[in-house]
Amino acid sequence: MLAIIQVGHNDASDRYIRNKVKAVMQAGMTAEVINLPETCTTLDVLDAITLAGRSSECRAIMVQLPLPDHINKEAVLRSIPEHMDIDGLNPRSDLMPLTPCAIMRWLKEQHIRLPGKNVTILGRSELVGKPLANLMIEAGATVTVLNSLTEEWFRRNACYSADIIVSAVGKWGAVFRDYVNNGKKMVVIDVGINRDNDGKLCGDVSHLARELVERNGGICTPVPGGVGKWTVRELVIRLAEMEGRHGTNIVPE
C-alpha cells in the first residue's frame, strides 16, 4: 500500500493525488490518502508519517508537496523511513526523485540521445532541477541551470542556443517566444502546472512559444498529460518494485 500524506488542499495537488490513486489502483495495488488540515503542525505531520510507517500493509510513503510555509519541510522529509521513501526526497535516500527519473525514461523512449546535447534547465529545486541536471550530465549532456537570479540576457541566450529546454519554474510564460530558436528543432519539456490569464490549466511555456516549437518540427510536451502523467507512471513502477511485483501489466497507459 502507498500512503499519501497531504496538508491542506490546492487544485494542482488534488488533481495530482487523484491521478496517483487511480493509477495505483488500476495496477492492482492500493493507496490511502491521509488528509491533514492546513492548520496542522509539523509534529502532526511527523506523527502521521510514524503511524503510516507502523502499518503492516504500508510499503511506501509520500508527502505531497508543496507544504504550507509553517511546516518544517526538511524535518518532514527526513522523517520518512528510507526504505519507504518512494519519492526519494529524504536526503539519506538512495533513490532519485520521481520526476527527473520519469523525464529520463521519456527521453529514452523517444530515442532522444543526450551525449553532446546542450540542455538548459530553468529552476534548481531539489525535486526536479538539481537531480535532473546531475542525471543529464552523467548521460553526456552539457547542462546549464538557471534560477530566479539569472540575468535575463543570459537566460534568453541559454534557452535560444539549447537543444533541450526543461522548465520547472511554476510560472506561466517563464518560457516565451524569444527563447525559441526559429532555426532548429528543439525539445521543450514543460514541468510547470499553472493557470493562464483565462484560468485554463497550462505549464510554464507560453502559447506563442509552444506554437513556434511545434511549427519548427520540435516537441513541446503538453500540460496536462505530459510530465505529470510520466511521473505517475514512474510512481507505479517504483511502488511495484517496492512491493516485490513484476510484470508489464503494472504500468498504466
What residue spans do the PLM features occupy?
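Flexible, glycine/charged-enriched surface loops at secondary-structure junctions
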Residues: 1-2, 176, 249-253
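Short beta-strand elements in bilobed, periplasmic/extracellular small-molecule ligand-binding domains
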Residues: 2, 24-38, 143-146
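Electropositive phosphate-/nucleotide-binding environments in soluble metabolic enzymes
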Residues: 14, 39-46, 70, 97-101, ...
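Short, well-structured alpha-helical segments in soluble
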Residues: 44-56
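Short, high-confidence coil segments that cap the C-terminus of an alpha-helix
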Residues: 57-58, 162
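Anion-binding alpha/beta catalytic cores of soluble intermediary-metabolism enzymes, centered on
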Residues: 60-114, 118, 156, 173
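Rossmann-fold NAD(P)-binding glycine/threonine-rich loop
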Residues: 73-87, 183, 189-250
